[in-house]
């Protein structure tokens, strides 16, 4: 079963669903990577399946969030979108069981 993808705002949804809007706001290279990463999300059955874009925890963000590289210093940020986020015994998010995500941001990586 593919990942369920939601969006934090209508603007983010539009940016992710309209190539023209993405190109206009982010530039062609970043828009192409965004399209590819969204295709990766749609093809994955869980977040743990994601490899491209170097998914990683982001300092200063909620532990249920991951940043995924796009291009030219841009990234998009997803978070687990479960009422009860699956957790490991350690308390960390069990990304192998997360099958619902929300795109919460597209921004320049300031790390």
Model-flagged regions — what are they?
Residues 37, 44, 55-57, 87-94:
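Intrinsically disordered, low-complexity boundary segments flanking structured domains
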Residues 66-111:
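Enriched for short, Lys/Arg-rich terminal
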Residues 6, 14-15, 40, 58, ...:
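Lipid interaction determinants
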Residues 43-66:
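A short, surface-exposed loop/turn module that caps and links secondary-structure elements
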Residues 36, 53, 61-63, 71-73, ...:
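Short connector loops at helix/strand junctions that flank enzyme active sites
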Residues 1-39:
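Arg/Lys-rich, positively charged N-terminal/basic patches that mediate binding to nucleic acids
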């Amino acid at each position: 079963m593919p990942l369920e993808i939601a969006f934090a705002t209508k603007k983010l949804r539009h940016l992710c669903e309209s190539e023209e809007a993405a190109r206009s706001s982010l530039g062609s290279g970043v828009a192409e990577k965004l399209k590819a990463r969204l295709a990766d999300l749609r093809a994955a059955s869980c977040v743990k399946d994601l490899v491209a874009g170097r998914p990683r925890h982001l300092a200063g963000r909620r532990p249920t969030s991951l940043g995924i590289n796009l291009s030219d210093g841009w990234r998009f940020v997803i978070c687990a979108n479960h009422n009860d986020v699956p957790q490991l015994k350690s308390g960390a998010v069990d990304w192998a069981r997360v099958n619902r995500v929300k795109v919460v941001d597209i921004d320049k990586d300031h790390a």
